[in-house]
Regions:
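Primarily NTPase-proximal linker/entry elements flanking Walker-type ATP/GTP-binding cores
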Residues: 1-117, 124-144, 150-169
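Conserved catalytic-core segment of NTP-binding enzymes
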Residues: 127-128, 147-161, 174-281
Length: 292
């Protein structure tokens, strides 16, 4: 019965777009927790396994977790402007995420400068500039094909000169296996010395997002991830795989098309959405959450 239920849980996780390596790691942790443990009085093996699974996944998502807003506040006290660099392949919603983060900070009374350092993608500079105008941020830019690192430097210098609080640098995202892209990003990173590097991944990309995260992590050592399009039909298991593959947390998630649709990534609520159809909802009660 034990192995049969474990096999069902494995299928559930794989169908949720969680990668094989992360699934194996979670099931291995479950086995180590369960072997030798006494069964509940009613002998309810299924419930015990479900609760252990939720606990294991929650632990995985909380590895190295940090709170976005608190971190910004701490950094502002130490050394304004706070510099945030966004990285990720094209099509993940990186530029829109830059605008959403800016909007979030502006709503809290902070001043934001956007650095249009994606000088490669057609329309990227205009897109970011349009967002900046709508949300009340300044945008520092150059012509298409310009020096990305110089744009980042100019944005930071401009923020320092005007006393702005935060600089958000949007970067190019041609496919992650292009060496020249990675060299360009390393140059931007070296020049900008960002306080925070965020990887932007698409919840719909599944295991492709995990591979992208792994490659960006090997080059830039990002601090956390933003998972976009979490409001879609994506199961979202990629979040678990990204956290496992990079040892970095998902800190924010895109939850819609509007500027305000950027939420703190909350592991337990994410897991209830991911698993509540497949496992006993009472398994979430260890966190005081009703998954009904």
């Amino acid at each position: 019965a034990f192995e049969a239920i474990m096999s069902e849980l494995e299928t559930t996780l794989l169908e949720a777009d969680m990668g094989h390596i992360a699934v194996d790691a979670v099931l291995s942790e479950m086995r180590s927790k369960l072997i030798g443990s006494p069964l509940p009085k009613k002998g309810d093996v299924g419930h015990l396994l479900d609760a252990t699974l939720v606990s294991a996944l929650d632990s995985l998502l909380r590895v190295s977790y940090w709170d976005f807003d608190q971190t910004i506040e701490t950094l502002l006290d130490e050394e304004p402007p706070v510099v945030i660099m966004l990285v990720g392949v094209n099509g993940t919603g990186k530029t829109t995420t830059a605008a959403k983060i800016s909007y979030r900070l502006i709503q809290r009374g902070l001043s934001v400068v956007l650095g249009a350092a994606d000088t490669f993608r057609a329309g990227a500079i205009d897109q970011l500039s349009d967002h900046a105008e709508r949300i009340g941020a300044r945008c520092v830019k150059s012509q298409r094909g310009g020096d990305s690192a110089a744009v980042a430097r100019d944005a930071i210098d401009s923020a320092k000169a005007r006393g702005d609080d935060v600089v958000i640098i949007d970067t190019a995202g041609r496919m992650q296996n292009k060496t020249n892209l990675m060299q360009e990003l390393k140059k931007v990173h070296r020049v900008a010395s960002p306080h925070i590097v965020l990887f932007v991944g698409d919840a719909l990309a599944g295991n492709d997002a995990v591979e992208q995260a792994r490659k960006f992590q090997s080059v830039l050592h990002f601090d956390g991830a933003v998972l976009t399009k979490l409001d879609t039909d994506a199961r979202g298991g990629a979040a678990l795989s990204i956290a496992h593959a990079t040892n970095r947390p998902i800190v924010l998630a895109g939850s819609g098309q509007e500027y305000q649709d950027l939420i703190d990534f909350e592991p337990v609520h994410f897991l209830t959405k991911l698993l509540s159809e497949d496992i006993d909802p009472s398994a979430f009660k260890i966190f005081g959450v009703d998954a009904q």
